Regions:
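Fe(II)/2-oxoglutarate oxygenase catalytic core
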Residues: 2-73, 79-308, 312-357
Length: 357
């Protein structure tokens, strides 16, 4: 195992199971009105209102159970959340991390391309909030020069992996949707790990990856922004290079399950390998993500719909098919979690659920 992986693991005190962090179990507090989007990833609560959970005397119990559910299912969807305000959205996602064990020093992320300097607001009045990222088809075209000549699969990612303390959970509420298009797709990092043979699993468990996001520097230079030096949601997240090293396989501390971490253009190099070897391994891991539609789920947005996902063990991508005459706009808040680590005592999702072959 890589020395950096061992160092990360030893920084956390073991608990009674022998694992670095004891996995959490739901209490059963949440209502049973839901359905699984696929057998592997995704759950939808068609009637549950997050604002009611926030205002309930059992708030912490509900939100803790929801955090565990999101970590187990990868992403959870909620329809027509018109009463969920921006302030509640930020408080909710921070509580989701805190009630499931994130460090006290981790808060809500501030995007390196400061929200207050962009030309889109969190509401029709144009108000800005540096703790809310406005997801906008218009802004995406401006900053990143989205092109129909690129593969759409280039967009697969987990949020903020270039940070030393990356994201645990994120929440997105859609404000405006086009008549058609703009769906988001999620994929399971747990299942990607489970699709590897045992020897290949052991191989990638010994690797670390250099994560970066040069697109942000390019976008900032293109439109005259400056990268915000931080701190960005955690004291460790400072500087303008936007580079961090993380294990290729990480343990989700909430479930105790192993997941592939980082995808495609997020990773510049596997540190322990020669450049050509690194390219081949990354190519194969990328194919696991893009070529297996049975470890993905797709969500068609309505106005005020909400998605909450676990960035430690899932990937997502928007579908860049919004017509230029229409707009897709939503407000996203991103909680920051812990330094990624691989627990040698952790298991795969299928092994934990008794589904391993």
């Amino acid at each position: 195992m890589s020395p950096s992986l061992v160092a990360n693991a030893e920084a956390v005190a073991p608990v009674k199971s022998g694992m670095i962090k004891e996995p959490l179990k739901v209490s059963g507090a949440l209502p049973p009105d839901y359905f699984e989007v696929t057998s592997i990833i995704g759950r939808e609560y068609p009637t549950l209102q997050l604002s009611e959970l926030m205002n309930s005397p059992r708030r912490d119990e509900y939100i803790r159970d929801l955090a565990i559910t999101v970590s187990e299912r990868g992403v959870v969807f909620f329809r027509n959340q018109k009463d969920l305000t921006v302030a509640m959205q930020k408080e909710f996602i921070d509580l989701l991390g805190r009630l499931s064990g994130k460090p006290e020093t981790s808060g809500i992320h501030i995007h390196p391309l400061l929200e207050g300097k962009r030309d889109v607001g969190i509401n029709d009045a144009g108000d800005v909030d540096d703790h809310i990222s406005v997801v906008s088809s218009k802004l995406s075209r401006k900053l990143h020069l989205a092109s129909r000549y690129n593969f759409a699969s280039k967009g697969w990612h987990s949020d903020m992996t270039f940070e030393h303390v990356p994201s645990d959970y994120a929440i997105l509420k859609m404000r405006k949707v086009p008549p058609t298009g703009g769906d988001t797709i999620w994929a399971s990092g747990y299942e990607m790990y489970d699709r590897l043979s045992a020897p290949y699993q052991r191989f990638v468990e010994g690797l670390t990856a250099k994560h970066a996001n040069p697109d942000f520097q390019a976008a900032a230079a293109r439109v005259g922004f400056e990268i915000y030096p931080g701190p960005r949601g955690a004291a460790e997240n400072v500087g303008q290079d936007l580079i961090a090293n993380h294990p290729v396989v990480r343990t989700n501390p909430v479930t105790g399950w192993k997941s592939i971490y980082g995808a495609l253009n997020q990773i510049e190099q596997l540190n322990e390998l020669a450049p050509q070897e690194s390219q081949e391994v990354l190519r194969y891991l990328g194919q696991l993500l893009t070529n297996n539609h049975d470890l993905q789920c797709r969500f068609k947005w309505g106005v005020d719909d909400v998605a909450i996902w676990d960035n430690r063990s899932s990937f997502h991508t928007g579908t860049p098919d919004v017509d230029v005459n229409h707009i897709r706009t939503g407000n996203r808040a991103v909680s920051m979690g812990e330094v990624p680590y691989l627990d040698p005592m952790s298991t795969s999702r299928r092994e934990a659920l008794g589904e391993a072959e």
